[in-house]
Amino acid sequence: MDHPGGHLAVVLLILVLVSMSTENNIIRWCTVSDAEEQKCLDLAGNATARNIRGHLLCVRGQSPTDCMKQIKNGTADASTMYADEIYTAGFCYGLDVAVGESYNGVDGINYYVVALARTSSSDLSLLEMHERSSCHPGMRTTVGWTVPIGFLVNTSQISVDEQCNFPHAVGDFFGYSCVPGVKDPEHDPKGNNPRNLCEACIGDENDRHICANNPRERHFGEAGALRCVAENLGDVAFVKHTTVFDNMQGKNQESWALDLELEDLKLLCPDGREANLFQHESCHLAVVPTNAVVVRLEDKCRVYKFLERVQNAFANATEGFSLFSSVNYGQPDVLFSDSTKKLLRVMGTYMSWLGPSYTTILKAFECEGTVDMLCTSAPRFFLILNFVCIYTN
């Protein structure tokens, strides 16, 4: 005669396993805007309608940092983040990345940060920039601030005081510059950032809005930094490798751009060399990676598999919901960048996705509070998890 307690134990075990299986199929996506939340809901509905395995829920975060906290605490599972946010998520919250965006279908390179100079400037070197003039797209931007200033710190050309006052160190180093936004209250609450960081700025046609962190300053942005060098107001401009080509050969109809030829400009390399504009792959300050989906380490596998199924269904959709289109959401790059061709699986850690050149740059700013020096990363058992992921459904 069977013992009734044995049957009860089996039933309870089955219920527990079913509950665990159901929970494991739920992906809670952390969104930070109304547009992201709506696209997340649309993705969830379309995935359900197509019987895609896994259940997507949309949760709201106040900011990328809030999403990091929610993912760490287990109230969310995934969120797409920029490269600098990925570094913070990994270093401070012990998180990792499951997939990354690819804009060419092959790798996760977003752009190269390069140093542009006029070809006629024969005595320039990135290793000897003291008292030179510089043009930056904007304050606290990856291209215009983080990468070039990180490079100068890492090459011991500038040193920062105990208060980690980077603007003062940069102002003491360069003769004069244009760093739009450096005097804004957001970046200069005490009003004592060096004035020479605005001396290469020109404002608008009426000499107003000088050093403004917007297009009213004509040297704002990457095109503005290029113009700054083209008009001989700066020795070097820090821009993306595509900036020159985006503004020449008739693509920019402003007079300064129409008068500029490719032969008028060159690249300055980190080792002191020079190169032509087409040699950015071997002459750059940093390679900035694309966005990636941040997750807990133990969820790399299941989030990747869910996104792989979603990608197969909606990445190349010509009608209805499209994973890499934001045309219906009132702004570009919602959830994923519109230029994404494919989501790539990240086999290594978040550090491998970010790459050595970019992470080395970011480490130069750790004392500034970009990353909390007290936080520690979680142990990385990614090789074991990737092995398990390959051999499970």
Predicted segments — roles?
Residues 101-176:
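A conserved helix-loop-strand patch within extracytoplasmic ligand-binding domains
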Residues 238-241, 290:
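Long, repeat-rich segments with strong aromatic
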Residues 72, 153-157, 230-234, 312:
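Sec-exported extracytoplasmic/periplasmic mature domains
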Residues 39, 68, 88-90, 123-126, ...:
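Extracytoplasmic/secreted cell-surface and envelope-processing proteins
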Residues 2-76, 81-84, 100-110, 127, ...:
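N-terminal hydrophobic or amphipathic helices and topogenic motifs
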Residues 58-69, 160-227, 231, 242-244:
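Short helix-initiation/N-cap motifs at beta->coil->alpha
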Residues 72-81, 133, 231-239:
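Alpha-to-beta junction loops
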Residues 88-104, 247-282:
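Ligand-binding "clamshell"
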